[in-house]
Amino acid sequence: MDKLAIQASPPLAGDVIISGAKNAALPILMAGVLAETDFIVSNVPNLRDVSTSCKLLRCLGAEVDELGNGQIRISTKNLNEFCAPYDLVKTMRASILILGPLLARYGTADVSLPGGCAIGARPVNLHLHGLEMMGAKIEVKEGYIKARVDGRLKGAHIFMDMVSVGATENLLMAAALADGETVIENAAREPEVIDLANCLIAMGAKITGVGSATLRIQGVERLQGCEYRVMPDRIETGSFLVAAAVTRGRIRCLKADPASLESVIAKLEDAGAKITTGEDWIELDMEGKRPKAVNIKTAPYPGFPTDMQAQFCVLNVLAQGTATITETIFENRFMHVPELIRMGANMELEGNTCIIQGIESLSGAQVMATDLRASASLVIAGLVADGKTIVDRIYHLDRGYEHIEQKFQGLGAHVERVQ
């Protein structure tokens, strides 16, 4: 099994090209099921979850051609299976996003209950309740969600009990082909939801309120394929910016989207970083200074993203001062803390809050990745730890970061993949 071996590295310096956003690419690939003609998606990152999504679409009978250079073409003309099996779904939570498109276009869907990162319950009841309000008959048995509808789904007024990115995306795709108007209140406002909505509009969907907490979808009878470019990955961007801040370096993230990262950029500036942005680039310069501690509280967009919490834990571990980090989105999302403590971090957990006293340096150790973003935080810690750090179970990392070791090497880091 692959591992990453990391040696203490100089301050990161140079340019890094940001990949397409995994969390936008996955729902957009699933939206291909809604299109009656060929659908071409570009800027798709080369990641395990993307490969799993392509396998799932092929398993349903869709033709999926990987055209190279981050382009994927999907044709549904021979789609004739409506079951997303356990062996595919268990490795990737986003498989649940096939439910809305299959049900809306074909009236039937059997989807195994999902797997993915083990960071809390992440219930699917919001997805199911919304689809039931649109007329679906749903039962959960033998580990599968079995959904049926006679004719088309019907437009409905849906109020989400809590903000859920996945449920918003599933219901948005389902509503695009429903009969009548659907209103989704308390909808997620994440940039990846906006990207999906813009893709659906390019296919012919009628959606207003994009980017707000109230989405209005006027269902249409059919959607056509189009060519669509996936947005840049804001979490990958943020991860590299934090790595540069922790190593007291200066880097530029190219093909990035500064507008999607305002809360993260604000916290990096609070930590002492000098940040300059252009339309599609972000430069961070620590001017050789140690970062200052910053308090963080995760929240749905436009608040601070939960997917950047672990990386800021590392920043605070090595910062000047004391900070608290409070996680409000997922339980179980401090699994990186025991690993960082093994490297010498001064951290204490109190419920959903982590109290961190900054220290001067960490010591290299053998550590274990437990989920996608936790593994990124351990890599960043390894860059500044004395000696050698080995990060085990990096298959988690490969689910969300494209060519991570090559990108770090390009910035001067001592990182290599080993067996």
From Swiss-Prot:
Entry EC number(s): 2.5.1.7
Entry annotation: catalytic residues: 117 (proton donor)
GO biological process: cell division; cell wall organization; peptidoglycan biosynthetic process; regulation of cell shape; UDP-N-acetylgalactosamine biosynthetic process
Annotated residues for binding of phosphoenolpyruvate: 22-23
Name of encoding gene: murA
GO cellular component terms, semicolon-separated: cytoplasm
Job of this protein: Cell wall formation. Adds enolpyruvyl to UDP-N-acetylglucosamine.
Cytoplasm recorded as keyword: yes
Positions of modified residues (2-(S-cysteinyl)pyruvic acid O-phosphothioketal): 117
Compartment(s): Cytoplasm
PANTHER family per record: UDP-N-ACETYLGLUCOSAMINE 1-CARBOXYVINYLTRANSFERASE (PTHR43783:SF1)
Binding-site positions, UDP-N-acetyl-alpha-D-glucosamine: 93, 307, 329
Catalytic activity of the protein: phosphoenolpyruvate + UDP-N-acetyl-alpha-D-glucosamine = UDP-N-acetyl-3-O-(1-carboxyvinyl)-alpha-D-glucosamine + phosphate
Organism: Shewanella sp. (strain MR-7)
UniProt record similarity statement: Belongs to the EPSP synthase family. MurA subfamily.
Pathway annotation: Cell wall biogenesis; peptidoglycan biosynthesis
Any one GO molecular-function label of the UniProt entry: UDP-N-acetylglucosamine 1-carboxyvinyltransferase activity
Designated name of the protein: UDP-N-acetylglucosamine 1-carboxyvinyltransferase
Keyword Cell division included in the entry's annotation: yes
